[in-house]
């Protein structure tokens, strides 16, 4: 093997997963041809299809394949067929959560942008959406109020209470901050750290540690913003943001807000990574069982997930940009799938994959 041979565990999953993953394969084929990179790709069952074939949503063989890979390209899991199962045995909880835990995927990256030609889909005011935006939300995934102890309920009657605890350790903040600054170096070199340091002790520590880490990256500018102001600024002027660095709960909120203001949630990729840059890359949307098998699903989120994989886990920045530029070219040319075409002629899932692959080869 050369240093540009990569092993990818491909987990198409359920619903539209296999259809859109087939388009990601086409795009990776084009990247191999153009850049001289080689991807060794093996597909494995995960989610509902794994329950049907192996009796559990994350078979040992699938987990082993992920352990032996440089990265995981994930489709989507779930559907009505498996909703009768106990929650922890359903495709989503039984596959994705164990993968995140097993590989210690503490960082979630969610890009959000308005592509040229799709401004009208944004719910933002026309003059704001016309300016466009290109944001990455860097969210800490394994700490904070979702996992802090103690948590629970106690008492009864008027004195019954429930409680959760926001806990962050210095090392957790340091490692997520470094990923935000490294990401900014590949972009416009701006990090905005989101906190509530006027109220929360955890946010005071967050701000202190992020400011310390910023000194390691003198070429990247750092600003701080309170979460309540950030939610407003995203509506008022999203173009001001480049990389938004967030705790678990704040990132949960802001990544969904960023997705919604694009107006095209079906095109957004997502990455979850650990400290060694091993990552799981997937569309931010679901398995869409209602349109599965109809060759009408939008494959762009899956294709852009492959671009994130190239950038963050494999270090192939030029190849990642080629994919993103090809997607932008296709959309700007009005080559759209049914979810975006409206009354205009729509491309099928497979035709969209072909178009994007051809733009890569002809650029």
UniProtKB/Swiss-Prot annotation:
It catalyses: (2R,3S)-3-isopropylmalate + NAD(+) = 4-methyl-2-oxopentanoate + CO2 + NADH. SUPFAM superfamilies: Isocitrate/Isopropylmalate dehydrogenase-like (SSF53659). Substrate binds at residues 100, 110, 139, 228. PROSITE patterns: IDH_IMDH (PS00470). Pathway: Amino-acid biosynthesis; L-leucine biosynthesis; L-leucine from 3-methyl-2-oxobutanoate: step 3/4. Pfam families: Iso_dh. It is an enzyme of class 1 (oxidoreductase). Binds 1 Mg(2+) or Mn(2+) ion per subunit. The record marks 146, 196 as: Important for catalysis. Signal peptide: none annotated. It is found in: Cytoplasm. One of its GO terms (cellular component) is cytosol. Mg(2+) binds at residues 228, 252, 256. InterPro entries: IsoCit/isopropylmalate_DH_CS, IsoPropMal-DH-like_dom, Isopropylmalate_DH. One of its GO terms (biological process) is L-leucine biosynthetic process. Its EC number is 1.1.1.85. Catalyzes the oxidation of 3-carboxy-2-hydroxy-4-methylpentanoate (3-isopropylmalate) to 3-carboxy-4-methyl-2-oxopentanoate. The product decarboxylates to 4-methyl-2 oxopentanoate. Belongs to the isocitrate and isopropylmalate dehydrogenases family. LeuB type 1 subfamily. This is 3-isopropylmalate dehydrogenase.
